[in-house]
UniProtKB/Swiss-Prot annotation:
Reactions accelerated catalytically: Endohydrolysis of (1->4)-beta-D-glucosidic linkages in cellulose, lichenin and cereal beta-D-glucans
Function noted in UniProt: Active towards carboxymethyl cellulose.
Active site: 176, 284
Origin species: Robillarda sp. (strain Y-20)
This protein's encoding gene: eg 1
Signal peptide (UniProt feature, chain positions): 1-17
Family annotation (InterPro entries): Glyco_hydro_5 (IPR001547), Glyco_hydro_5_CS (IPR018087), Glycoside_hydrolase_SF (IPR017853)
Record-given protein name: Endoglucanase 1
PANTHER family: ENDO-BETA-1,4-GLUCANASE A (PTHR34142), GLYCOSIDE HYDROLASE FAMILY 5 DOMAIN-CONTAINING PROTEIN (PTHR34142:SF1)
Length: 385
């Protein structure tokens, strides 16, 4: 009986310890370019620390030292890294890159956590003034102003060459491609993967699908991600799928109430991942401080923990420039954010105090990966508590 119980305990431990990486999305690096009149060039290149910033080191300290998070998804804009005057590719704005690298190094070197590099561009380039809809679709050969698939690969080859010695850096190929052919999403992803590996970078890659890379829609529609996204090739077999999943009625994350059951809506994706022997991160999810979201957010986090296909997550969103504004709930936009110390517009506690601490923080695994390279198979789980 002792052997039976020992084997059972081992199986149960393996089944429950599937989350290796947990944290927050750091959103502010993409700020400062939006224009109500969709005026190209608005906010470019922008003033670092005034129009945009990547992280608050003090907030990262709180999330690592007190909340014991080991993953941060750091947003940036392609147009700031690769100015439109020179085009998408290997020519970087070195001043901007240095600011970005400083943030990534603080997370990974100083704090010993992991960082996802997040080009927050919706598979578009040259005009972020009306995101997520402005700009030319990368690889669209019918648009003479569009950056090419080859240029996208060149960009990723250059970026990877600058981080290939940092095993704690994860390459998130693109935020939320949408309204384009899934075959083009695959082609762009593959160009990036090929260039990253050619740059002698063995880092973990996370790869998006089409239709805002939504988990609920992964197998749906006439051109679903599920039909093609399993055809990518990575010679190192170190690429995971990047998923976003919100719980409001239209899956946008823009409403106060959570009404979409994650177990039901992720079932088809989870089956697809299992069938194709793939792993996934959910790098965007979140909700308001409503009762419905307080009930359903744990359902999503527990679903990931209970299904071995999911190995990491980042909640949307923290970031130094949110102020009282909210990364959720466009019908009530000033509830604060997941940034420590955030407050709502009326001075009451923000989403960090009303959602993160009471709802999400208790579900952060007590053991996460704190050493070794990020990978689809994870690493040794240890506690920092």
């Amino acid at each position: 009986m002792k052997l039976v119980f020992s084997a059972l305990a081992s199986l149960l431990s393996g089944a429950s310890a599937t989350i290796y990486y947990a944290g927050v999305a750091e959103s502010s690096g993409e700020f400062g370019v939006w224009s109500a009149t969709q005026t190209p060039g608005t906010g470019l290149p922008g003033r670092f620390g005034v129009d945009y910033a990547f992280i608050s080191e003090a907030a990262v300290d709180v999330h690592v030292d007190q909340n014991h998070l080991n993953l941060f998804r750091v947003a940036f804009l392609l147009e700031r890294m690769c100015p439109p005057a020179t085009g998408l590719g290997a020519a970087f704005n070195e001043t901007h890159f240095d600011y970005f690298k400083e943030a990534v190094d603080y997370i990974t070197v100083t704090k010993g956590a992991y960082a996802i590099l997040d080009p927050h561009n919706y598979m578009r380039y040259n005009d972020p003034s009306y995101q997520p809809f402005s700009g030319s679709v990368i690889g669209n050969t019918s648009d003479s102003t569009a950056a090419t698939t080859e240029q996208f690969g060149e960009f990723w080859g250059e970026l990877a060459s600058r981080f290939n010695d940092n095993e704690r850096v994860i390459f998130g190929l693109m935020n939320e491609p949408h309204d384009m052919a899934t075959s083009l999403v695959l082609a762009n992803n593959q160009a990036a993967i090929d260039a990253i590996r050619a740059a002698n970078a063995s880092n973990l890659i996370i790869m998006p699908g089409n239709s805002w890379t939504g988990g609920h829609s992964w197998t749906e529609g006439s051109d679903p991600s599920s039909a093609l996204l399993n055809q990518f090739k990575d010679p190192l077999n170190n690429t995971a799928i990047d998923i976003h999943e919100y719980l409001d009625y239209d899956f946008s994350g823009g409403h106060l109430e959570c009404v979409s059951d994650p177990e039901t809506n992720l079932a088809a994706l989870t089956a697809w991942l299992k069938e194709n022997n793939l792993k996934a991160f959910i790098t965007e999810f979140g909700g308001s401080n409503s009762t419905s979201c307080q009930e359903m957010l744990p359902d999503l986090i527990n679903y990931m923990a209970d299904n071995a296909e999911y190995i990491g997550w980042t909640a949307w969103a923290a970031g130094p420039f949110w102020g009282p504004n909210s990364p959720c709930c466009t019908n009530s936009t000033q509830l604060g954010s997941l940034e420590p110390g955030s407050t709502a517009v009326d001075g009451s506690p923000g989403l960090y105090d009303t959602v993160w601490l009471p709802v999400i923080q208790p579900l952060v695994p007590t053991e996460l990966q704190w050493s070794g390279p990020a990978s689809i198979s994870g690493g040794e789980l240890t506690s920092r508590a």
